Amino acid sequence: MGKITFYEDRGFQGRHYECSSDCPNLQPYFSRCNSIRVDSGCWMLYERPNYQGHQYFLRRGDYPDYQQWLGFSDSIRSCCLIPQTSSHRLRLYEREDHKGLMVELSEDCSCIQDRFHLSEVRSVHVLEGCWVLYEMPNYLGRQYLLRPQEYRRYHDWGAMDAKAGSLRRVVDLY
């Protein structure tokens, strides 16, 4: 079970809302979100209701302002608790529909380009565990939650282009 608390103001001030499960619409509980405390679990936050818009991956910890979670604004409108698994494995493909060069990962990768010489990823097959794909190296830029399934093209995971800089397994480190 997870627990996350959203605060309207920076530094854990102002009106707040505590959540322990997926919530497709947070709008009734707060108008803006400027700080977050994650007490347990790993969470994906979304800037719009129904798990749409920019995504932000948060692990246990304190985030005193939205820049701490690489947020573009103070808009958080939905969230989901990411299930934990003991093993992680996925395949990246250079072309759509799982074609072209394929590489398999079971560990975090801070720079896909340096490690595999892939500047773009056009399809993904997540075999085990949940992952976060970042558009830039070193876990920066836009973030995309990848669950166990086949993603035949980058639009399937919500991306506007095939940029893929780094990958991180969803693991609660505590």
Curated annotation (Swiss-Prot):
Domain of life of the organism encoding this protein: Eukaryota
Domain Beta/gamma crystallin 'Greek key': 2-40, 41-83, 88-128, 129-171
SMART domains: XTALbg
Gene3D superfamilies hit by this protein: Crystallins (2.60.20.10)
Pfam families reported in the protein's UniProt record: Crystall
Keywords, ordered alphabetically: Eye lens protein, Methylation, Repeat
Sites bearing S-methylcysteine, chain numbering: 23
Single GO MF descriptor: structural constituent of eye lens
GO biological process: lens development in camera-type eye; visual perception
InterPro entries in UniProt: Beta/Gamma-Crystallin, Beta/gamma_crystallin, G_crystallin-like
Database matches in SUPFAM superfamilies: gamma-Crystallin-like (SSF49695)
Keyword check for Plastid: no
Start and end residues of each stretch annotated as Connecting peptide: 84-87
Quaternary data: Monomer.
PANTHER family in the record: BETA/GAMMA CRYSTALLIN, GAMMA-CRYSTALLIN C
Free-text comment about domains: Has a two-domain beta-structure, folded into four very similar Greek key motifs.
Family named by the database record: Belongs to the beta/gamma-crystallin family.
Chain's role: Crystallins are the dominant structural components of the vertebrate eye lens.
The protein's name: Gamma-crystallin C
